[in-house]
């Protein structure tokens, strides 16, 4: 089936719309500075996740992208009046002779999404997506789009790229849905709250407190602690330390310091502290609708037995519920602690879109590989076998 036919099949049953696309022009920009004004303007009327903020992805591109061989590949679609309708925040990599465009942010973005003009996204059609892909093919600058970890819906809007051929992502994302005004026990049960309160009382005599970092000095101090403790936690779990990869620490520090309009930072840091020690931090992105965790760790000291990470998570949930947020997620993956708070799953998908013959071969390979990974991740027998093999060859 061709991509055009696949788009049409996904639109079957939808209200009839014009066969004429509103996209009149597709441009590719390889300079963040050149794209910044349009990007920031779209942010004010966007449909996208907080992971697509310019200040977050520009920090990643400046500090991490070059070290991964990723160059800015920012696609902007405009109408006849040169009004921006969509901005694809992509990075171009050359892998095995294939020019592949992926979302900026790499493994540090839980969700990837195009920045859409909301009015355009609401009525996006098969003709619009076909025009976007046609414009990219005409540029002959990329063989394949590897668009992974996209939410199918965001803020009650359907993600227009869900009309393209897609498959479920390797991992799901546990999510807690919050109904504004509901009692706290609808978010976290009474019995679980009592267990956490009992642990919390044991910390009260030690100057225990929860806070959201709001000054540069606080942010710097908490990040210094994180980058000292996290490697020990990763080593304890026999996991690779992704935060030690080139450029990652500089990226995170830059994004955590960057303020956003209305208060807060591009990455917010929530912390639990005692008089003489940080005992847990959770850091993530927020947009007034949803808080999404990016990274966390907790103390290596004896205070870890009081479950400071769990206590902090309860504070974060209540903090955002009081501000009428509608959802909280703890990142991709099915870690057991996430299920204690997040009972639902976010529907996320991958799309591998070939634009050339070479891209078609690569898209088939990447699609098949990700399907195999998902099969292993969601089959306990295969997962245990894979984990044993990983330990043998580590």
Regions found by a protein language model. Name each.
Residues 118-123, 182-189:
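Short, polar/flexible loop-turn hinges at active-site or ligand-entry regions and domain interfaces
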Residues 2-25, 32, 151-185, 323-388, ...:
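Active-site/acyl-donor-binding loops of N-acyltransferases
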Residues 120-121, 130, 243-363:
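Aromatic (often tryptophan-rich) hydrophobic motifs at membrane interfaces
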Residues 106-141:
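A gly/proline- and charged-residue-enriched helix-loop-helix capping module
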Residues 140-141, 230, 324:
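Residues at helix C-cap/C′ positions in short coil/turn segments immediately following an alpha-helix
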Residues 133-155:
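ATP-hydrolysis module of ASCE/P-loop NTPase motor domains
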Residues 105-116, 167-177, 206-209, 346-349:
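Acyl/amide activation-and-transfer machinery of modular secondary-metabolite enzymes
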